[in-house]
A protein has these predicted regions:
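Cyclophilin-like peptidyl-prolyl cis-trans isomerases
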Residues: 1-119
Length: 120
């Protein structure tokens, strides 16, 4: 089996790298990596930052309302939990409404399990 991809995030607060779980959330990972490779996320801000909870980005409008023009189905990989800081998940407005927006947890957030697809 091939190794999972890694994506580098460059922000005004520094640089970090995320492993993308192509092995555990293949459809969600493919969607995210396709957007990365198309340059969709280039220059997009983290429009929502909640200390002790999460940072959210991936909206081309910067308002929290933007998307790539389509929605993807939720994908909940076996064993994936919001049990630590640094979990990368799809943001959504309800079931099967993810697209491009994502968030990274700053603490364990178990109430999000089964509601937001983890892919990194």
């Amino acid at each position: 089996m091939s190794e999972n991809s890694k994506v580098k995030f460059t922000t005004n607060k520094g640089v970090f790298v995320a492993e993308i779980f192509e092995d555990k959330a293949p459809n969600t990972a493919k969607n995210f990596l396709d957007l990365v490779n198309k340059g969709f996320y280039d220059g997009i801000i983290f429009h929502r930052v909640i200390d002790g909870f999460m940072i959210q980005g991936g909206d081309p409008t910067g308002t929290g309302m933007g998307d790539p023009g389509y929605k993807i189905k939720d994908e909940f990989g076996e064993g994936l939990k919001h049990d630590d800081e640094g979990v990368l998940s799809m943001a959504n407005a309800g079931p099967n409404t993810g697209g491009s927006q994502f968030f990274i947890t700053l603490a364990p957030t178990p109430w999000l399990d089964g509601h937001h697809a983890i892919f990194g």
